[in-house]
Amino acid sequence: MAAKHVIYGEEARAKLKAGVDKLANAVKVTLGPKGREVIIEKKWGVPVVTKDGVTVAKEIELKDQFENIGAQLVKEVASKTADVAGDGTTTATVLAQAIFTEGLKAIASGANPMDLKRGIDEAVALVIEEVKKASIPVTSNKEIEQVATISANNDPVIGKLLAEAMEKVGKDGVITVEESKSSETTLETVQGMQFDRGYLSPYFITDADKMQAVLENPYILIFEKKISNIKELLPVLENVVRVGRSLVIIAEDVEAEALATLVVNTLKGVIRAVAVKAPGFGQRRKDYLEDIAILTGGQAITEDLGIKLESVTLDMLGQAEKVIVDKENTTIVGGKGDKKKVEARIEQIKKQIKETTSDYDREKLQERLAKLSGGVAIIRVGAATESELKEKKARVEDAVHATKAAAEEGIVAGGGTALAKASRVLENYTSANKDRELGVKIVYNACKYPLKQIAYNAGYEGSLVLEKVYEDQDKNYGFDAANGEYKDMVKAGIIDPTKVVRTALQNAASAAGTMLTAEALIAELPEKKEKTPTPTDMPPDFD
């Protein structure tokens, strides 16, 4: 076991702060409509130019191990916020830095870290309650377009496309983002569906950046039972390899021996495959598998048919243009089933919905109907250069998440307004425990930081802007940094999804609280490498 280096107390917190500041100072310049660009050097290829906070955060690794702990904790805040809400990564980073910096000052003046954390947690709960009260449900297509435009760094073309995509596939529909072969950004709707089951092994991953297994033009084996014996599966695998295609296996389970063989052959490049558990249970699983079979033009191999796995032929397998599998979901894009059969299946489910007397059954049938009829919207992102394409694609992916978040929990005034106004609930907070009160005060001040930073990035004096916005009693009155005007943010279409604001504050406070209550840091000592002697190190020749 390698030797470790341990530091404590004040020294540990100072190192954490140095790491937090290095990461946060690079990320926060991207905040707002006038956020600055960050240029990231790449070992291969051209540098990446981005205004996406999470992209900047992911690139930062610090040489000092203890500083790096602080940077990685804040990076986790940005990543978690992006995963859950799709946006708000920079806001979360700014909040984490603000809470941690203010908290350190309090600890230096003698405050108890645990009481501070309790105060911070209480304040966050109160502010989130206020944000929820101010939330406006998203109903119109215009509002969806506004959210998408802001999330895509104020790109109205992307906003319009996303609103159109959501109109076609519904709020719960599947929207995927791909790279276009031309410089145009286009929208297409195809047959497809998504279900909540992920890959059975991470070794199937083909895209390490997104942690996804992406298979182009695969065959799809739809099997009702467990696959435990690899011998049963071999004929299918051999047939698929022979035609040079990839394979998606959807089954009740793929057990140890069969899964191990599949993984080994995938890693060796013998076959491109991914195994996924079938969705649902009992009769519902059969129904789901039948839906997938009709959508992909295959056959659900169930017990009732009396077909053994080893006798399955290629014409019994489903097909699709693409299948994307991540840790939690499987998305079938462009199922190659007969459209008439898909429509007949949809009509059959609609009839069952009308006839059922059980609310639970009706809910599950409606779920199946939405999956089967919604289809999949594909946004193909185009750009003139490779670096622009990557940056634009990341923005579109953020916008997809944020737009869905808005449909889920509603919207609030954007531009940092919602948090600044919600912090009013903490203005007159008092407690018998003064350190706890101090924790609440820290969140009260931190909630105003995003608004100040947005104004500062746009070239305005943050404190003056904050003062004017905060004093106005209208919950939607804020500062439009793009035009340098004070206005009703919701009417102007400057809005944030409530889920984004909530998630950013919760994640930031959680990470900052963890760092404030940390009393020791442990890191591995770097190994000293033996210096290889060079000709200049040789002893002199005494001949």
From Swiss-Prot:
Localization of this protein: Cytoplasm
Gene3D superfamilies: GroEL, GroEL-like equatorial domain, TCP-1-like chaperonin intermediate domain
Biological-process GO terms, alphabetical: protein refolding
Any single Gene Ontology cellular-component annotation: cytoplasm
EC number(s) per entry: 5.6.1.7
Chief location category: cytoplasm
Any single Pfam family the record assigns to this protein: Cpn60_TCP1
CDD domains assigned to the protein according to its UniProt record, in alphabetical order: GroEL
Alphabetical UniProt keywords: ATP-binding, Chaperone, Cytoplasm, Isomerase, Nucleotide-binding
Record-listed ATP binding positions: 30-33, 51, 87-91, 415, 480-482, 496
GO MF terms held by the record: ATP binding; ATP-dependent protein folding chaperone; isomerase activity; unfolded protein binding
InterPro entries: Chaperonin_Cpn60_CS, Cpn60/GroEL, Cpn60/GroEL/TCP-1, GroEL-like_apical_dom_sf, GROEL-like_equatorial_sf, TCP-1-like_intermed_sf
Source taxon at top rank: Bacteria
Catalytic activity: ATP + H2O + a folded polypeptide = ADP + phosphate + an unfolded polypeptide
Subunit structure: Forms a cylinder of 14 subunits composed of two heptameric rings stacked back-to-back. Interacts with the co-chaperonin GroES.
Task of the protein: Together with its co-chaperonin GroES, plays an essential role in assisting protein folding. The GroEL-GroES system forms a nano-cage that allows encapsulation of the non-native substrate proteins and provides a physical environment optimized to promote and accelerate protein folding.
Annotated family: Belongs to the chaperonin (HSP60) family.
HAMAP family in the record: CH60
Protein name in the entry: Chaperonin GroEL
Organism from which the protein derives: Hydrogenobaculum sp. (strain Y04AAS1)
